[in-house]
């Protein structure tokens, strides 16, 4: 029987070769890994940077809008605020909810500033009597906001939208400090945790003690990521990063919902690899489902891996897991001799959209 005992993140995987810094230099053409080496530093500098703070009054509804790498940012904020008293809506598309009114704050995020869906939402928000703030590195969004007197904050892009999650997140936390019900202690705890896990997972530790490398080596086929509701943004981010960086197909399933349908697919032999993404403080019934699913996998000789969050607040859990799993996708890409940076298919889609507009 396979040993499925868990350390802080997940069990040590089988060895599939040695990853060396020369491999990262060879296959990571735009040196994405170096940005991740600096993620904790970028996060801290972003939060401590001088920013013109914003205070909107009488807000009882926050709408986050963003796609792709920017969408991961709004997913993260939606998760952070999930237990607050503020009504939170998430837009991944073109349309604002009809519940938007004068007490709504619409937060628009597009790292590039040129995202078609997000620009459409921004234009719609302009026509409604609601509060709006937009964040981007420039692009069409900056010009639109300037021409229409919409509150705008420019945040630099690091490498690509997906790698810029870290500085956008902590800059927004700083700028919207008076609006977002997030304790400063929670933010500082998250920064400390990033500093801590960097030593385990960055490119200065390419040994078998690196949990991101171990998971990257274990992955050899299509992964299916089982997640609890509170960690859905982490699962979605992991899926997206595997798709963009490692150019691989990925499946995600809510662990509770999967017990009513998805689990049946394991009655057929499959090369799909299950990853169980778990929170330290998951609801007791959720923990029970994970235990049952693990029992089912072991009984049926299905190899799986577990990824557990650290203890702490939701920001610390989500950002540290995203850090770990983003690194996993880079290492997996390089081990597969794939350049993690280019996204040629996305470039094709953007070109087609631009030509059709």
Segments (PLM) and residue ranges:
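C-terminal active-site/capping subdomain that shapes the small-molecule cofactor and substrate pocket
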Residues: 264, 269-344
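Short, small/acidic-rich helices and loops at N termini and domain boundaries
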Residues: 339-357
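Polybasic, low-complexity association/targeting segments
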Residues: 17-29
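Active-site phosphate/pyrophosphate-binding segments
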Residues: 28-35, 42, 50-54, 60, ...
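Glycine-rich phosphate-binding loops that contact phosphosugars or nucleotide phosphates
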Residues: 53, 57-199, 217, 279-284, ...
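Conserved, well-structured ligand/cofactor-binding cores
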Residues: 30-56, 97-102, 188, 305, ...
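N-terminal amphipathic/basic-hydrophobic helices that include classical n-h-c signal peptides
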Residues: 1-19
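A generic structural motif
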Residues: 88-93, 248-259, 303-312
